[in-house]
């Protein structure tokens, strides 16, 4: 069973679900929902600046410790 993580929010994606997006340069992005895909591809948002992503919470915890 191959469980993948969302390229935007970091949530785990079950097999046979989610979106697979391939850029022109050949890099592959996995998304759990349309919300994540639109935020990264269309709106060009950075995951560390969006409050509901795992990346944001990870960086916030690091700065809180320091």
UniProtKB/Swiss-Prot annotation:
A zinc finger (C4-type) spans 6-36. Binds 1 zinc ion per subunit. Pfam families: Ribosomal_L24e. One of its GO terms (biological process) is translation. Its cofactor is Zn(2+). SUPFAM superfamilies: Glucocorticoid receptor-like (DNA-binding domain). GO terms for cellular component: ribonucleoprotein complex; ribosome. InterPro entries: L24e/L24_sf, Ribosomal_eL24, Ribosomal_eL24-rel_arc, Ribosomal_eL24-rel_N, Ribosomal_eL24_CS, TRASH_dom. Keywords: Metal-binding, Ribonucleoprotein, Ribosomal protein, RNA-binding, rRNA-binding, Zinc, Zinc-finger. GO terms for molecular function: rRNA binding; structural constituent of ribosome; zinc ion binding. Zn(2+) binds at residues 6, 9, 32, 36. Part of the 50S ribosomal subunit. Forms a cluster with proteins L3 and L14. Belongs to the eukaryotic ribosomal protein eL24 family. Binds to the 23S rRNA. This is Large ribosomal subunit protein eL24. It comes from Picrophilus torridus (strain ATCC 700027 / DSM 9790 / JCM 10055 / NBRC 100828 / KAW 2/3). The gene is rpl24e.
